Amino acid sequence: MKKKTVCTLNMGDKKYEDMEGEENGDNTISTGLLYSEADRCPICLNCLLEKEVGFPESCNHVFCMTCILKWAETLASCPIDRKPFQAVFKFSALEGYVKVQVKKQLRETKDKKNENSFEKQVSCHENSKSCIRRKAIVREDLLSAKVCDLKWIHRNSLYSETGGKKNAAIKINKPQRSNWSTNQCFRNFFSNMFSSVSHSGESSFTYRAYCTEFIEASEISALIRQKRHELELSWFPDTLPGIGRIGFIPWNVETEVLPLISSVLPRTIFPTSTISFEHFGTSCKGYALAHTQEGEEKKQTSGTSNTRGSRRKPAMTTPTRRSTRNTRAETASQSQRSPISDNSGCDAPGNSNPSLSVPSSAESEKQTRQAPKRKSVRRGRKPPLLKKKLRSSVAAPEKSSSNDSVDEETAESDTSPVLEKEHQPDVDSSNICTVQTHVENQSANCLKSCNEQIEESEKHTANYDTEERVGSSSSESCAQDLPVLVGEEGEVKKLENTGIEANVLCLESEISENILEKGGDPLEKQDQISGLSQSEVKTDVCTVHLPNDFPTCLTSESKVYQPVSCPLSDLSENVESVVNEEKITESSLVEITEHKDFTLKTEELIESPKLESSEGEIIQTVDRQSVKSPEVQLLGHVETEDVEIIATCDTFGNEDFNNIQDSENNLLKNNLLNTKLEKSLEEKNESLTEHPRSTELPKTHIEQIQKHFSEDNNEMIPMECDSFCSDQNESEVEPSVNADLKQMNENSVTHCSENNMPSSDLADEKVETVSQPSESPKDTIDKTKKPRTRRSRFHSPSTTWSPNKDTPQEKKRPQSPSPRRETGKESRKSQSPSPKNESARGRKKSRSQSPKKDIARERRQSQSRSPKRDTTRESRRSESLSPRRETSRENKRSQPRVKDSSPGEKSRSQSRERESDRDGQRRERERRTRKWSRSRSHSRSPSRCRTKSKSSSFGRIDRDSYSPRWKGRWANDGWRCPRGNDRYRKNDPEKQNENTRKEKNDIHLDADDPNSADKHRNDCPNWITEKINSGPDPRTRNPEKLKESHWEENRNENSGNSWNKNFGSGWVSNRGRGRGNRGRGTYRSSFAYKDQNENRWQNRKPLSGNSNSSGSESFKFVEQQSYKRKSEQEFSFDTPADRSGWTSASSWAVRKTLPADVQNYYSRRGRNSSGPQSGWMKQEEETSGQDSSLKDQTNQQVDGSQLPINMMQPQMNVMQQQMNAQHQPMNIFPYPVGVHAPLMNIQRNPFNIHPQLPLHLHTGVPLMQVATPTSVSQGLPPPPPPPPPSQQVNYIASQPDGKQLQGIPSSSHVSNNMSTPVLPAPTAAPGNTGMVQGPSSGNTSSSSHSKASNAAVKLAESKVSVAVEASADSSKTDKKLQIQEKAAQEVKLAIKPFYQNKDITKEEYKEIVRKAVDKVCHSKSGEVNSTKVANLVKAYVDKYKYSRKGSQKKTLEEPVSTEKNIG
């Protein structure tokens, strides 16, 4: 590592690192002086032969003299065994050993090490934060200067005026960039220090040393290191919040470190600060932390956030976005600066170093926590990003709340305000924190004083009134947060500040909207209230802006505040509870105040609708000029902020490990509050948002677009998930927000626990967050224009997101592709260190679209205008609704949890997420499948095929995005080359075999399948359509000949040539040709397996090729595809495609087209396969009754028919769902893989057999028989040829059942095999076809065989069924089978005593078992309750006993009632 690091740093460091790396563990060197040619210097790894060799005096490890000497300079100990040495013996053949004294440069080395380690970290950060770095670069110059100063200060432990001046000069020269970078850098330093500090005091000291040394390094290469540091800072600020929150930094260390920070930061204002290191350190620390957060945001927001002086002008220059950005940055810096000034001026003077020292420690801790808290709030604010998005303009007001000039800037550009908002809130937070820190220093009751001051300010002045409301709300929120924080004054203050900040920001947002000036005013007021010297600067701003803004602001603010109050009231209420729990006097006082506010807020909440209207109106009036949208944003901001605050409280509470329990309670409460607040705020925001939305959208759009450019949008990619969410953006947005908030809370907790992770997480999240705002406007606009057009950004360009395609794709997304993608991403996210990234992404998702719209939607959703959305929100909470959304949400939630949880838990949760995702997808697919099946059943014309195609096409559109790849791939594999396909198929069969082995993996295959399925569907629909157009009717009319000839034509007679060929290369060729024929062969094969599912039907020889595929392939497929089929079944639309593929597109189309004809054809042909399959599918789609009759008629097995009816529907559902979820994999395997694998697997054994049988039957019997024999031979090579056909039919039927039912098929299978299903199947089969004989006899063998395959299928199915439970049918069938088995066991177990006691006869025993099993299996609960079974059995026994005695009625009633119970 060090070597790498060194390499990154510089050659010198590199060498040192090499030595260090050697030191760290180059144990490869030989221990003896004797070395061979192979021996290499452990340090340089060069051969020793050609170099001067030496060894340390204390050991015999051989090194290059140059290396060891250099090493000794760094560290005079053997790199290998660490033995210290003072001299190195140089070995020379002439002179022997020459002792060479070593020059020591331990200090240098140590510094280098520190520097290297620091730089390494920086490098990592730099690499990861390349985006931020650009912005950070701005700070770098100042950072380097500050770093140098900090280093100097640290070394001298003095605040050097020179250093300060130097910094000041630097600031002046590079006011914006330098200050900003410096602040962030310092924050980063502090973050580093704090991270370590939070872990241990020593760590902090070490970090201090590192910082100091690092500063030296910075001096060496200021810019580079500054950049790295900035990057590092970007990382560490994130980490810092958690660390700061932890606030475990020993105060002595903290004071030491903080002074450096303070010296660095304050220097910007006061080169020499009278403030004690501790106090100033604390302030600085809090500030640094705040600034760090701020800096991160600033980074994203602007490169010149730190020029405090310059920011004013830029703020005034609000007109230009950049100037606004700079102004914001400057304003933020200025705000920061003023807090620093305050700290140095007011606090330092007021509180004197000594007195401040103590408060400093607590304060610094508090501030540290506050900073983290602030960060938590920021996290909260990330949901607030939604706010920010909503408040793009509000963001500006928010910023303005941070700084008056910022307000102006906000007015100038909501976009920059949003960015600034992040920064400024941080700045405000830092300022407030600093101010509050000072206040804290001034009195333990600083919170009270702050609140009181705020309240007083409210009382004192209208200006203060506005601020007062801001303050009150902030106080409330802070107080609320405070209780949550468990009375850490710093934290509470921070929360309070955050709350105030949020409130002020909200108010200021409006104010800034109304009057940019005023925004700064409330903040200033707060700052002034806090007794900050900053008030001078801010006061100037305030004074300038106050008058104009004040009246309007008061109105808007008060109203805005009220809405804010509502959430805050909830918050305060909960917080109050927390406060009570925490038993903090200050908290209680705040609580009281809050309670009052809460009462008002409660009233406001009650009045919220009115307030919304009035607010909307008033705000419109007030903010008309500024921007109504800011107000909406403000509301959103307030809402988010409340949530944020809640999250912050939660996070902060979590941060306060001492108050973990409280924080947990707070989290729960806060989550509830968040929900409540969100709802209330949503409602309010909804009304408010609706008005300003139009205005806001443009501004937000512009702002965010600008932000987008200014920010690193690399992070925006996460929106891909968002795009998915955007489909359900309305319903999902809020849930996402809630989930996000929850996640944020979790994340903050996680961050607390993961001090190291937070920095990167936060940085990423921040970037994402910033990206989100930028995205959200675009998304909003896109949504306005094209709800999902933006998705094109996030999704592969292959998919052009048109509204039309969008719907299918939307569905598709719900289907596996996007959910999987999302799941994968989410899982990745959850795996990724940053929960925040995920939550940020989740937020993005929720907010990606117009935050306002989202909020409005969310509100509407919350208002349950859309039960679905509400449900979705609930599902987010209950995970009961839309599986997709829920899944994505759940993933989001679980991911934060996962992050919190152990890796195993992560993987488990991820897998659970995936499963739930799949379940959701399957459910949706199932729904679609049902719809599709209904539509199919409704029409049996080519249009029906088209319907399927459309179902497919639905997938096709989806697939079109994916299918092209697959198609290309398939084309390469051999769409046009059967052999090529053969190759592919070989792989596929292998894959399929693996699938067979891993039926469990079927899910994964299915996951893969979706692509293939897409392709499959795409292809299938196309060629199905072609076939339908080309002559499905003829084929249908002469299904055998047409299909056979068609398939053979398509397959080049591959199927027709010989089953051996078909099953052998021929079979592959068929498939390949089918593919060549647009997948006919493939579909044949896929259909073959489908037909095989329908192979019960599948005496469909019409597809002689199909039969080939169907036969052998189908058989294999049946086994392998049992699960596969399940997948396909889930994909109904895929199923049609597959069916068409299997049967031949035309035959399938024909059957679909001519259901009656097909039925007739089936009955005429007796080839239940072709006719039944199409008839089956159609019938299934049309009616289970028809399906039953047709299937019974067409199916060789009643079981096949019955199951096909039910099964097929389930299959359809399952296949559709699975195909939806897994359409690609399904298609892949259905095409080559699924079919191939089964064929390959089955073919291998059956292959030999059924080539014979198929050939024999093929020749002897029409294709129908060939298909049957083929399937039979494939599926049941063991059975004799005659039985195989029937057997195959049976087997196919049962196995198709298995496939169709996959879980169920097994049951149907097994049941067939067992008795009930089998009996119907054979019965139907004989009735249906002469083949029934075979099925009966063969049914047993095939049945048993199918059992085996079904067992595998069942296993896979079971797993799939877990995911597929959504496909009630397939899971039902599977469940049925399981239930039957279990029921049989239970019944036998229960009846055994009676039988042993001779209470019943053997016949009665059998009858009771049969009836009881049947009853249990048909119970509504679908579960086998041993108690109920026992009761049922007992009832039956009694029934029979009494029947003998003539009291049959009573007995019958009893079982009935028992059965009811069971049911």
Curated annotation (Swiss-Prot):
Widely expressed. It comes from the Eukaryota. There is a cross-link at residue 676 (Glycyl lysine isopeptide (Lys-Gly) (interchain with G-Cter in SUMO1)). It is found in: Nucleus. GO terms for molecular function: RNA binding; zinc ion binding. There is a cross-link at residues 596, 601, 610, 676, 1126, 1178 (Glycyl lysine isopeptide (Lys-Gly) (interchain with G-Cter in SUMO2)). PROSITE patterns: ZF_RING_1 (PS00518), ZF_RING_2 (PS50089). Residues 457-470, 807-829, 851-927, 979-1019, 1034-1052 have a biased composition (Basic and acidic residues). The modification Omega-N-methylarginine is found at residue 1151. Residues 1104-1114, 1336-1349 have a biased composition (Low complexity). GO terms for cellular component: nuclear body; nucleolus; nucleoplasm. PANTHER family: PROTEIN SCAF11 (PTHR47048:SF1). Interacts with SRSF2/SFRS2, U2AF2 and SNRNP70. This is Protein SCAF11. It comes from Homo sapiens.
